[in-house]
Each structure stands twice: as structure tokens, then as C-alpha cells.
Amino acid sequence: IVFAKTKQAAANLSSQIADRKGSGQVVKRYCAVVRRNADVYKETETAAEYQELTDYLQRDRRTNTSYIVPKGTKGAKESKLRYAILEETEDLSLVDIELLTGRHHQIRVQLSGAGMPIAGDKKYDEKSAKTTGTREKETPALCAYSLSFQHPKTGKQMDFTVLPEGGAFEKFRKE
């Protein structure tokens, strides 16, 4: 989360967010732990090779969910993201994600739709929804780990990162 101290700074930051392709843009990166899908890996054999997903999402406010729908569906919005597989275990993968659009539950919906549901996501992954008991408090293994933008007054590049924490991320932690 970024807070502005003045109206001018808020306007500058809003402009950077709106201008995703310009210089000084706000860049927010995510990482997720996803369940491995053999079909997806045949297409992206090279680790850290970015792939782009483009889908059309429709939001259901009643159920607080979003769905992939055909292009041209009334109320659907084009949704794009880029992802790269960074590391793998036998059944999980660590994925780096860059949103090119910002839609409701976009990462969760698009990765699940591509056959790579986020570990612990009971809303968009049937397998996670069926596992209860000791994992009831498990949350989706999704983390906004990096935020970059230009300082509104000085123009200096500001970069902030965090190390993802939680059960699924621990499987990829280097000792």
C-alpha cells in the first residue's frame, strides 16, 4: 500500500498507476505457489520464460467471485498477466507474476483457468476446497512481493520488496 501526503503526490501516483506503459510506472509483482500441471509444463519447458495469459473475466458480486467467460460476453473485461515458472518440486511450482491489468481476483482466476491453481485457494481450486481439517486456516499462497514507483516529488526510483511467508512458500525457501 502506498500513501500520499499531499494531493499533488496522490495525483502523481495515480498518473503512474494509470500509465502502465510509460516511464515511472508503478510496477507490482506477485509470486504464488501453484499446483503443478504437466500439460502446462510441456508448453513452458524453459524455467523463467515468461508466458502471457489473456482472458475475459466477469465478476459475480453476489458470490464475490470472478469467472473466465468468452470474449464479447456482456460485462466481461479483458484481463492480462505474465508469469514465469521459477522453481519446481514434484507437485508444486513457484511462479512470478506481473499483472498487465488489474481485475477482481485476476491472478487466482487466470492461473486456475490455465490449470495452475494456487495452493490453498479454496475459492478457485476444487482440490484445496476439499481438503479441510488441519488446513482450514490455510490461505492462498499468493504474495505481492515487490512494488516500484517514482517518488512523486524527487523522481527517485523507489523499490520495496518482502520475502513471502507461509506454508507453501517454505517449500521453496533456501537455507
What are these regions (language model features)?
Residues 1-175:
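RNA pseudouridine synthases
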